[in-house]
Amino acid sequence: MKTVFAILFLAFIALTYARSYEDVKEEIKNEVEKEILEDLEEESDELNDKRKEINDAKPWRWVRRIRWKKLIPYIPVVVAAAGKK
């Protein structure tokens, strides 16, 4: 709601001090474009933050890819070899 009031206020200022209709039109267009770009930057920052949260678990995905059924028979051999130091 604040952005709407800001745009309307800037439009009022532009109408007050403008020399012609084209100047007013250009000023309003520039302000609206600026607001849109700022909003897009904020949204992209939010999306980047979410992407970082999602990617936090990715380093552990390799654990899920291990074929544990194939490795289980070798575990006692590894434990025995480690105990014979």
Curated annotation (Swiss-Prot):
GO terms for cellular component: extracellular region. Antimicrobial peptide with a broad-spectrum antimicrobial activity. Keeps its antibacterial activity under a wide range of salt concentrations that mimic physiological conditions of human blood, which is surprising, since Hydra is an obligate freshwater animal with nearly no salt tolerance. Does not affect red blood cells. Belongs to the arminin family. It comes from Hydra vulgaris. Keywords: Amidation, Antibiotic, Antimicrobial, Immunity, Innate immunity, Membrane, Secreted, Signal, Target cell membrane, Target membrane. The keyword Nucleotidyltransferase does not apply. It is found in: Secreted; Target cell membrane. The modification Alanine amide is found at A82. The lineage of its organism: Eukaryota, Metazoa, Cnidaria, Hydrozoa, Hydroidolina. This is Arminin 6494. Residues 19-57 form a propeptide. Its main location: secreted. Expressed in entodermal epithelium along the body column.
